[in-house]
A protein has these predicted regions:
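Short glycine/serine/threonine-enriched helix-capping/active-site loop
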Residues: 22-23, 47-51, 77, 141-142, ...
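Non-catalytic, C-terminal membrane-associated alpha-helical segments of glycosyltransferases
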Residues: 158-166, 177-228
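A short, conserved alpha-helix in the catalytic core of glycosyltransferases
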Residues: 94-145
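Short, flexible, basic/aromatic active-site loop/helix in glycosyltransferases
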Residues: 68-94
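Glycine-rich, basic loop-to-helix element that forms the pyrophosphate-binding segment
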Residues: 1-15
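Short beta-strand-to-loop acidic/aromatic patch adjacent to the donor-nucleotide binding site
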Residues: 17-28
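Conserved donor NDP-sugar-binding/catalytic core segment of glycosyltransferases
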Residues: 27-62, 67-69
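A short, conserved beta-strand element in the Rossmann-like catalytic core
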Residues: 2, 26-29, 52, 119, ...
C-alpha cells in the first residue's frame, strides 16, 4: 500500500499476533521471504528484506539505507547495482524504506503509529528518526528477498509536492514557528520562480508546480492529503 500513514489499521494486523508487516502493492515476494524475516529479526528490532527491481530482477532497488536526521535526507544503498556478495551481509542500518518493513507489536506500542499528517511520502523517514530516538535497532536482512516494480508516481507532480512539503515538516519538527518560516523562504522563492517560468513557456503543471505548492502549503500549515 502507498498511503501507509493509515496505520491505525495496524491494530487489526497485530491483534492476533506479535508482528505487523507493511508491504507496498507494487511488489512481488519470494515464497520464503516472510519466514526468513521472522526467523532472523533480532528481538526488539525492526527489519526489512533485500529489495530488487522486478525488471531487471537481479538489480538492487534497496539494500539498506542511511538517514541524516537533521536534514531528513536518505540514501538507498546499492541502488541500481547488480545483486552480489556485497549485498549478502546482514547489517544494522539507520534507514528502512516502508515499501516493506516488519514491525514487532512491542515496537509499535513503544514508538506509536506513523504520522498521519504526512499522508504520503517521508512517513518512513519520520518513523525511522523516532525509532532511533527510542533506541530501536533497524536491520537489513538480505536472505529475505522481494521485488519492487518502482517508478509508478515517483517523480510526478504529486510525489514532488508531498516530498517538498513533508521534508520541510520533518526538518522543522520540534523547532519554533519562526524557524519553520525562515526554512521555507528559499523553497518558496525557488519554487515560485520555476513555476512562473513553466507558465511563461506555456507548459502544463508538473514538478515545478508540485514543489511550489508543497512549500506554500507547508507555510500555511496545510498537511494531510493535498486539496484542490
Amino acid at each position: 500500500m502507498r498511503w501507509t500513514t493509515g496505520v491505525q489499521h495496524i491494530a487489526g494486523l497485530i491483534a492476533a499476533g506479535n508482528f505487523a508487516l507493511l508491504l507496498n502493492n507494487d511488489t512481488s515476494v519470494r515464497p520464503d521471504f516472510l519466514e526468513k524475516l521472522l526467523a532472523e529479526t533480532p528481538a526488539g528490532a525492526v527489519s526489512c528484506p533485500k529489495m530488487l527491481f522486478m525488471d531487471p530482477p537481479d538489480e538492487i532497488w534497496f539494500a539498506g539505507g542511511e538517514l541524516d536526521p537533521k536534514t531528513g535526507k536518505v540514501k538507498h544503498l546499492g541502488g541500481h547495482k547488480k545483486d552480489g556478495p556485497e549485498f549478502a551481509e546482514k547489517k544494522q542500518v539507520s534507514f528502512i524504506t516502508f515499501c516493506c518493513v516488519l514491525l514487532p507489536r512491542a515496537v509499535i506500542e513503544k514508538v506509536g503509529y506513523l504520522d498521519e499528517t504526512l499522508f504520503m511520502y517521508c512517513e518512513d523517514v519520520d518513523y525511522c528518526i523516532r525509532l532511533a530516538q527510542a533506541g530501536v535497532p533497524m536491520w537489513f536482512l538480505p536472505d529475505a528477498v522481494i521485488h519492487h516494480k518502482a517508478g509508478g508516481s515517483a517523480g510526478g507532480m504529486l510525489s514532488v509536492y508531498y516530498i517538498t512539503r513533508n521534508t520541510l515538516y520533518l526538518t522543522c519538527k520540534g523547532k519554533s514557528a519562526a524557524y519553520a518560516k525562515l526554512k521555507t523562504i528559499l523553497p518558496l522563492l525557488t519554487g515560485a520562480a520555476r513555476y512562473a517560468l513553466t507558465k511563461l513557456l506555456g507548459r502544463k503543471k508538473g514538478r515545478s508546480y508540485g514543489a511550489f505548492r508543497g512549500a506554500v502549503d507547508f507555510w500555511n500549515g496545510k498537511m494531510g492529503r493535498m486539496k484542490g
